[in-house]
Structure formats: structure tokens, C-alpha cells
Amino acid sequence: MTAPRRLRKELSDLQGNALKSFRDIKADDDNLLRWTGLIVPDNPPYNKGAFRIEINFPAEYPFKPPKINFKTRIYHPNIDEKGQVCLPIISTENWKPATRTDQVVQALVDLINDPEPEHPLRAELAEEFLKDRKKFVKNAEDYTKKHSEKRPAD
């Protein structure tokens, strides 16, 4: 299956699945290789907001992994200030062409709901998460209230 055919199918499948944690999924009108969507986490401290992401697929997809970037700022040890994500499923060494976008999105939602401080992009947040969870949760909640997008109504 060619990249455009596979991407159209995956986009259609994702849009039809009505995932509560990934909404408003669309491809760029001029570029099927660029998608946007809204991550809607279930767990505190992120469950008071929603986070816009962009998924960029390489022309060689599915043989090369997509890249995910957060467009909404988030206080999270695995996502840096530029919105880059440390997500093992899409690392070059772990990527498998059979991996579908819905699996990638689910791994991302799981990471948001359950940070992995042992693989941080922001060491200071990982340290705070490990040493003072209460402070981390308060900071993340405040940051989410200030910077996140409004959650869609169910």
C-alpha cells in the first residue's frame, strides 16, 4: 500500500473511531503528510485541558516513522519547550512499518497520562516528578489551566 493510500485509510479509521482521548483529527488540505489533532487526557494534572498536536509523516512512510510535535505548551518531563516528544514507539531504532497511527496516538496518550521520568527531555521536570510529586502536579495543573486549549464537549 502506498503512503497516500495508507494515510487516507488510517485517517478515515481514526476519524471513525471516535476516540475520547484524540479528537478533531484532520489532514492539512494541501498536504496529506501533515495531520493535526487534539489530545484530551483523562488523568490529572492534564485532564483540565486539551493539547493540539501536529503529526508529520515522511514521504517514506510507513518505512520511516512520523514525527509528533505539540503545538500547545505542556508541563511534562517527556515533552520539551519546543513541543518535541520522547516517544519510544516512533524512535528510528524501534519503528516498525506495521505500526499504525492509532497505536502511535495511543502510546502518546498513555505517555501524557503516565509520564516516564526515566526518559526525560526536561530533566528538571523529571526530577520534580520523582522527588516532589505534589509540587509537580500543582505546577502542571496551573500550567495546563494557563496554556491548554478548551476541552471539547462530549
Swiss-Prot record:
Q: Give the record's GO CC terms.
A: nucleus
Tell me the GO BP annotations in alphabetical order: protein linear polyubiquitination; protein polyubiquitination; protein ubiquitination; ubiquitin-dependent protein catabolic process
Name the InterPro entries on file: Ub_conjugating_enzyme, UBQ-conjugat_E2_core, UBQ-conjugating_AS, UBQ-conjugating_enzyme/RWD
User: Keyword annotations for this protein?
Assistant: ATP-binding, Ligase, Nucleotide-binding, Transferase, Ubl conjugation pathway
- According to its UniProt record, which residues of this chain constitute the active site? C86 (glycyl thioester intermediate)
Does Ligase appear among the keywords? yes
Any Pfam family from its record, for instance, is: UQ_con
Q: Which domain of life is it from?
A: Eukaryota
User: PROSITE patterns per the record?
Assistant: UBC_1 (PS00183), UBC_2 (PS50127)
Gene Ontology terms for molecular function: ATP binding; ligase activity; ubiquitin conjugating enzyme activity; ubiquitin protein ligase binding
Disruption phenotype annotation: Nuclei in larval muscles (myonuclear), are mislocalized and often clustered, likely due to mislocalization of the LINC complex, demonstrated by the aberrant localization of the complex member Msp300.
Q: List the disulfide bonds.
A: none
Q: What is its EC number?
A: 2.3.2.23
Boundaries of every UBC core domain copy: 2-149
Q: Which SMART domains match?
A: UBCc (SM00212)
Record flagged with keyword Transferase: yes
- Which reaction does this enzyme catalyse, per its entry? S-ubiquitinyl-[E1 ubiquitin-activating enzyme]-L-cysteine + [E2 ubiquitin-conjugating enzyme]-L-cysteine = [E1 ubiquitin-activating enzyme]-L-cysteine + S-ubiquitinyl-[E2 ubiquitin-conjugating enzyme]-L-cysteine
Q: What is known of its domains?
A: In contrast to other ubiquitin-conjugating enzymes E2, residues essential for lysine reactivity are absent: Pro and a His residues are present instead of an Asp and an Asp residues in positions 88 and 119, respectively.
* Function description: Ubiquitin-conjugating enzyme E2 that acts with the RBR family ligases LUBEL, ari-1 and possibly parkin. Accepts ubiquitin from the E1 complex and catalyzes its covalent attachment to other proteins. Appears to be involved in the selective degradation of short-lived and abnormal proteins. Functions with ari-1 to control the subcellular localization and morphology of muscle nuclei (myonuclei) by regulating the protein levels and distribution of the LINC (LInker of Nucleoskeleton and Cytoskeleton) complex.
- Subunit field text: Interacts with the E3 ubiquitin ligase ari-1 (via RING-type 1 zinc finger).
Concerning its family, UniProt says: Belongs to the ubiquitin-conjugating enzyme family.
Q: What is this protein called?
A: Ubiquitin-conjugating enzyme E2-18 kDa
